[in-house]
């Protein structure tokens, strides 16, 4: 049994890395279609109006809330991102759970962001408003 695990483990690891790579690429395309207008190509948003996604302390501290914002349409009330207050509500984009996962994987691995967490469709699907 141990030999089977040793044999299959590299394929499992490769498969995870490969699926993340595909998710990030799909997320990039979706970001360009749905997010770039407000958050800009560099993910920096507009200070005080549109929160940044690049180097965002909020994304890491409030991961689930960030995903819910994408899934259900914004966050109610004021948030503070990198020390700056924001109080504008993002529209619901109408993305499917797998697309939300892809966009989040792209955001979490772009513009200097690096996450070892893979957001999956199943994870997004379980989130309730």
List PLM regions with ranges:
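Axial heme c-ligation environment in periplasmic c-type cytochrome domains
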Residues: 47-54, 75-129
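A contiguous binding-surface segment within folded domains or other stable secondary-structure elements
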Residues: 37-78
């Amino acid at each position: 049994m141990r030999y089977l695990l040793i044999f299959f483990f590299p394929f499992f690891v490769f498969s995870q890395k490969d699926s993340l790579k595909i998710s990030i690429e799909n997320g990039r395309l979706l970001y360009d279609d749905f997010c770039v207008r407000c958050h800009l190509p560099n993910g920096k948003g507009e200070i005080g109006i549109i929160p940044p996604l690049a180097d965002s302390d909020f994304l890491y501290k409030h991961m689930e809330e960030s995903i819910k914002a994408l899934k259900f349409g914004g966050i109610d009330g004021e948030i503070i991102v990198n020390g700056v207050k924001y109080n504008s509500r993002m529209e619901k984009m109408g993305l499917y759970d797998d697309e939300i996962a892809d966009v989040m994987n792209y955001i979490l691995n772009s513009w200097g962001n690096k996450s070892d967490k893979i957001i999956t469709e199943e994870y997004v699907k379980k989130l309730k408003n």
